[in-house]
Amino acid sequence: MITTSDFPQYFNYSDKIIIGSSELLDKTIMRYTSERTLNDIVKGKFFVRQRASFNDEREHGIYQDGGKAFRLILSGEDIPQHTIQIDNKIESSYNLYTSCWTKSNQEDVLMWKAYDADILIRTTVKEFLDSINMDNIRLIICDEIKYHKEQWKSTNLSKELFWKVEAYCNEEEIRFYIDFNYNSNDTISYLLLKKRFKNTIMFSPLKYKKSKDDIIKLYNIPPQRIIKSEIIENSLR
């Protein structure tokens, strides 16, 4: 079982939430996503994915290249118990659920295209965390992704969860891992929200055609929370 003691350098925001540092709380984060996310937020939920479900293995954390993923064990030497424990925690970490955001404040046309997104949600780490209903959650771990030239098999749980290769560095990712209080056989797709987190919404300049008035009425969004795309002028009529 993964616990807060596996991340001794992390900041304890609450008894169930740890983050890489307290400075992250005020960090602005953005997420390119589908319009369905707005429907979900209105209904008090937020979609998450299990870590093991990502098709790209490099999205899992440390990518275990078969040519490099080994440990030197002397003949007749037993694998240290601590190493076995860490390996077990790393294995169990694939059952964690994830929510991936970017800390970039700059709207990016390539991100719009890569995610085929309808909307961009902008909020802060604190606003998002404070909106989550923690009743059925055992632990949330949040940190910035660190980017490195290569990814090697690690005995460090933090590196396993928050390291990626440099090819992904333009994402400037902040990731939330969620450990639910459910049985391993339970199917989970959503975080439950105890309140709607404060955010601003931008609609894709590449595909979104609804008028601003339609958007405000449909999702009960205050007009001041809808912002225009800077990529194409008058992206919202």
Predicted segment positions?
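Partner-binding and oligomerization surfaces adjacent to conserved cores of proteins
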Residues: 1-237
